[in-house]
A protein has these predicted regions:
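Short coil turns linking two alpha-helices in DNA-binding domains
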Residues: 25, 36-37, 51, 65
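Recognition helix of helix-turn-helix/homeodomain-like DNA-binding domains
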Residues: 34-50
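DNA major-groove recognition helix of helix-turn-helix
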Residues: 44, 54, 73
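A short, Lys/Arg-rich alpha-helix, primarily the initiator
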Residues: 1-24, 28
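DNA major-groove recognition helix of helix-turn-helix/homeodomain DNA-binding modules
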Residues: 53-68
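Alpha-helical residues within the helix-turn-helix
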Residues: 20, 31, 60
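Residues in the helix-turn-helix
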Residues: 28, 39, 68
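Short amphipathic recognition helices of helix-turn-helix/homeodomain-type DNA-binding modules
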Residues: 69-78
Length: 78
């Protein structure tokens, strides 16, 4: 069983992979995440800097499902 922090790490990895699959631009990711203007510019330079809260907002906005997330994590979804 994964610990909560480990789950968060897997979640972030999965969402970043999924974003690449949907070919979303960094600008779209930043807007969807609801970043403040100053933060937005840092995020578009390096999407790895998105926080877990911002990434979760993107899951909801783009309706990423578990099977899609799992496939990009390289694990079997149940």
């Amino acid at each position: 069983m994964l610990k909560p922090k480990e789950m968060d790490a897997y979640l972030m990895k999965a969402i970043k992979g999924t974003a690449g699959y949907f070919k979303l631009s960094p600008e779209e990711l930043a807007r969807t995440a609801g970043c403040k203007k100053a933060t937005w510019y840092r995020r578009i330079k390096n999407p790895e800097n998105f926080t877990l809260r911002e990434l979760r907002r993107m899951i909801i906005r783009y309706s990423w499902d578990a099977s899609t997330v799992c496939s990009f994590m390289g694990v079997e979804g149940k």
